[in-house]
């Protein structure tokens, strides 16, 4: 088995286009599978007889809570997988196994705590997140089951990250694809055949993750693997130092995911206030459609990161600029396809989620408005991840949070006063445009500094100048 941390020298020599495809395609498959995983539930739930419109609106109400659960997962998973990769690179397998064990224990502790607290106050939380008397029963039915299986979800995604970090990305991708395919098959059985409605969608989701978790657990309980979990329960003790390091490293991604939770909460509240239950359902549909294209671009970004980071560290700035430009081109093409789908065939895509005429009309108009600036969104995403790839974390976080908190949240509260729920939709392209302008300013500053350096110059020189900027 390949060891994570082994330096792939091809990153500095192989043709950039071939490298980007080599690294991006598996990530795109995994990201697309993740987005389809979320879409499948929405599509089937939206077609539940007689109550589909309110059911999909109830599902949309749960988005902030789901985002918060994801944020807690990244808090543990990102930090632990980062430390694990470093230890494997040092061939310190004993310490790596301790990190793996602590990742499991932290996920159990956080998963149980989140479920207990949330279940204790579920109805007030859902009402705060935008539920009404019409949508609360559906949101509650879905979340009760999801929360009961929350530990399974945390353990599965956490261990899947560890599989990837340990040098087996194909297995991690395969498990993701498996959950999507099995969920697609099981959803209609539980929702329609067994007539369980939105509860059936939640049960199918948890069962699919349980099956994937069982396989992943078997992988890590194999004592012949250099990375494995202990069999004796006496060995399951939390190491405070490892836990602290993992949570510290994961704090950045946690904050960014938490920002998404806050933004979704505000959107739901404003949609309910100015447009009613169906407006929230329309946002849920638009969110799922847009998310599909965004996740493809995330795959390109994941492919770019190791290439840009390696060549930056090696002082090969020409290759750094080349991979950035190629990734921007690819992401822009994807974003333009998303724009065409949104502007010229919204009815076709929205019809996948609902047959309700009123909900379809709201989602059609919302999709057109929300994605007006979509052709440039790919560029902004690449810029954010480019700074992260070069170790300029503060600029990356600034670009990510500015779009959501600095630009989008004020617009969500300001524009509906004048334009009703249409103002919420209008907030997206305006915030995207503002974020694109900020990204361009930061990138121009960076590339001006690149021009002063030749390939082979010490990257620390560039880094020190950037810190002073």
Task: Pin down the residues of each PLM region.
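Hydrophobic transmembrane alpha-helices of multi-pass small-molecule transporters
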Residues: 68, 183-188, 213-217, 291-292, ...
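Helix-terminus/linker motif at the lipid-water interface of multi-pass membrane proteins
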Residues: 32, 36-57, 126-133, 189-196, ...
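Transmembrane helical elements of multi-pass membrane transporters/channels
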Residues: 22-41, 145, 179, 208-212, ...
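Membrane-helix interface/capping residues of multi-pass secondary transporters
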Residues: 42, 53-56, 93, 122, ...
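N-terminal transmembrane alpha-helices
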Residues: 11-51, 64-79, 83, 108-115, ...
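Short alpha-helical transmembrane segments in multi-pass integral membrane proteins
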Residues: 1-24, 84-151, 193-250, 308-373, ...
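Short runs within selected transmembrane alpha-helices of multi-pass transporters and secretion channels
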Residues: 146-164, 175-183, 201-216, 297-301, ...
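Small-residue-rich hydrophobic transmembrane alpha-helices
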Residues: 56-116, 153-172, 282-340, 344-346, ...
């Amino acid at each position: 088995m390949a060891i994570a941390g082994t330096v792939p020298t091809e990153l500095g020599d192989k043709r950039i286009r071939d490298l980007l495809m080599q690294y991006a395609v598996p990530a795109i498959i995994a990201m697309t599978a993740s987005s389809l995983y979320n879409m499948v539930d929405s599509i089937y739930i939206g077609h539940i007889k007689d109550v589909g419109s309110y059911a999909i609106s109830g599902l949309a109400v749960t988005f902030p809570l789901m985002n918060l659960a994801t944020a807690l997962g990244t808090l543990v998973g990102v930090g632990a997988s980062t430390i694990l990769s470093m230890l494997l690179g040092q061939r310190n397998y004993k310490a790596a196994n301790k990190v793996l064990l602590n990742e499991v224990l932290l996920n159990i502790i956080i998963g149980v705590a989140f479920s207990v607290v949330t279940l204790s106050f579920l109805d007030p939380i859902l009402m705060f997140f935008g539920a009404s008397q019409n949508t609360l029963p559906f949101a509650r039915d879905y979340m009760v089951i999801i929360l009961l299986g929350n530990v399974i979800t945390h353990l599965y995604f956490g261990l899947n990250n560890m599989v990837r970090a340990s040098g087996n990305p194909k297995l991690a991708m395969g498990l993701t694809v498996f959950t999507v395919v099995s969920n697609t098959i099981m959803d209609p059985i539980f929702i329609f055949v067994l007539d369980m409605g939105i509860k059936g969608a939640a049960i199918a989701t948890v069962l699919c993750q349980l099956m994937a978790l069982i396989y992943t657990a078997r992988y890590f309980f194999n004592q012949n693997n250099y990375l494995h979990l202990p069999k004796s329960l006496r060995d399951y003790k939390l190491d405070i130092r490892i836990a602290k390091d993992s949570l510290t490293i994961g704090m950045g991604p946690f904050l960014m995911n938490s920002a998404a939770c806050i933004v979704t909460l505000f959107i739901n509240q404003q949609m309910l206030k100015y447009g009613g239950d169906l407006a929230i359902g329309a946002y849920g549909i638009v969110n799922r459609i847009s998310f599909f294209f965004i996740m493809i671009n995330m795959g390109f970004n994941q492919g770019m990161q190791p290439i840009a980071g390696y060549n930056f560290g090696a002082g090969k700035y020409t290759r750094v600029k080349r991979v950035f430009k190629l990734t921007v081109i690819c992401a822009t093409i994807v974003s333009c396809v998303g724009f065409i789908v949104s502007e010229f065939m919204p009815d076709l895509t929205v019809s996948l989620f609902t047959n309700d005429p009123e909900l379809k009309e709201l989602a059609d108009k919302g999709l057109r408005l929300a994605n007006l600036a979509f052709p440039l969104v790919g560029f902004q995403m690449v810029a954010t991840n480019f700074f992260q790839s070069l170790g300029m974390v503060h600029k990356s976080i600034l670009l990510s949070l500015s779009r959501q908190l600095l630009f989008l949240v004020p617009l969500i509260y300001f524009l509906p006063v004048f334009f009703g729920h249409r103002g919420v939709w209008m907030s997206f392209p305006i915030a995207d445009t503002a974020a694109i302008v900020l990204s361009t300013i930061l990138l121009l500053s960076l590339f001006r500094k690149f021009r002063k350096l030749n390939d082979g110059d010490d990257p620390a020189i560039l880094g020190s100048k950037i810190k002073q900027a």
